[in-house]
Design a protein with these regions (language model features):
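Substrate-recognition/cap regions that form aromatic- and gly/pro-loop-enriched pockets
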Residues: 161-239
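Active-site-adjacent substrate-binding region
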Residues: 29-30, 36, 41-43, 51-64, ...
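Short histidine-centered catalytic/ligand-binding loop motif
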Residues: 89-92, 113-118, 203-212, 273-276
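Midchain, well-structured core segments that form catalytic/ion-binding scaffolds
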Residues: 1-176
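General structural feature for long, well-ordered alpha-helical segments within catalytic domains
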Residues: 40, 44, 95-98, 153-156, ...
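A short small-residue
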Residues: 77-85, 168, 198-203, 264-271
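Zn-dependent metallopeptidase/amidohydrolase metal-coordination segment
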Residues: 163, 222-297
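Generic non-transmembrane alpha-helical segments
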Residues: 51-64, 98-109, 113, 187-196, ...
Length: 299
């Protein structure tokens, strides 16, 4: 469930759901994003109780937004982003964030003619969401952190919904060993208090690591380098594997980074997932020799 050479460290995981104050008679009828919290949404759909022709044309990200009229007289905003995994936001575009940006634009246009697009409760929560979606590293929320071993914290606001008179935004945070779930909660307090937002914490897992100097890690990395002719080093990642369920374990392949795939083939966990037969055969050889070497160690 990972890549070569050796992943000896996994970031901590923190999940929370932000909840708006009670919304009565709101304009935002529905709002959807990612299906799962660990997915960066490639599309987001928001239905507003207003005629489509009353909304201004988008300015920023116009090529990624579509505004259409629904049969019930409401407007639908459809955002096209670039999806990915929550732990690897590079090169992605969060579709929910595109709609947040548009709603802020539209509100400014309405304000300019002394009108209101959203109710006060919606307005405050959308302003809050602008901080949540400021970037993929938690800077807007004030929770950003980094460390040499683990790299930067990542924050994915992927799942969004309207439920029981409230708007809810879920975040998936992968954090380094320089911060903690308790610290993140403390850092969130000023912003949620400012906008009258409440939140509930879901998942919270501490970072996990095995030293790169561990004899077992050295045996694995040395074996990999011998077979590939590389000088690779162990790495940390934001994803999670079963390794963290053990006191002393790492993830070791079988995928290779930068492997050229056929046009019809997809990456691990993606549509049309495929593998290179020659690379799998090499991985088998690496595993056989690595296991024999581990067997010689006092673990």
């Amino acid at each position: 469930d990972a890549e070569f050479p050796v992943c000896n460290a996994e970031k901590g995981q923190f999940g929370a759901t932000f909840v708006s104050s009670r919304i009565d008679g709101g304009r935002i009828v529905s709002w959807s994003g990612a299906e799962a919290s660990n997915a960066i949404p490639s599309q987001s759909i928001c239905e507003l109780a207003i005629a489509a022709d009353e909304l201004p044309a988008p300015v920023e990200n116009a090529e990624r937004l579509e505004i259409t009229a629904l049969e019930n007289g409401h407007a639908q905003i459809f955002a096209h982003g670039i999806g990915g995994h929550a732990s690897m936001p590079e090169g992605t575009i969060n579709a929910v964030g595109l709609i947040v940006t548009y709603l802020r634009e539209a509100e400014d246009a309405f304000d300019a003619r002394d009108e209101r697009l959203l109710t006060p409760a919606e307005h405050e929560f959308v302003k809050f969401l602008a901080f949540v979606h400021a970037d993929a590293y938690g800077r807007g929320l004030g929770i950003d952190a980094t460390s040499p071993a683990f790299g930067p914290l990542t924050c994915n606001p992927g799942v969004i919904r309207v439920a029981d008179g409230h708007i809810e935004q879920v975040i998936d945070v992968r954090f380094p060993d320089s911060t903690s779930a308790d610290t993140i909660c403390e850092q969130l307090e000023p912003l949620v208090g400012r906008f009258g937002v409440t939140y509930r914490v879901g998942r919270a897992k501490v970072p996990f690591s095995v030293s790169a100097d561990d004899p077992a890690v050295k045996a694995l990395i040395d074996t990999y380098n011998e077979f590939t002719g590389k000088h690779a080093e162990p790495f940390a990642m934001g994803g999670g594997t079963y390794a963290r369920n053990f006191a002393r374990a790492v993830s070791f392949g079988p995928e290779e980074t930068g492997l050229e795939l056929p046009a019809w083939g997809g990456q691990m966990h993606g549509p049309n997932e495929c593998a290179n037969e020659e690379q799998l055969k090499q991985a088998l050889k690496i595993y056989i020799v690595a296991i024999l070497r581990l067997n010689e160690l006092e673990l």
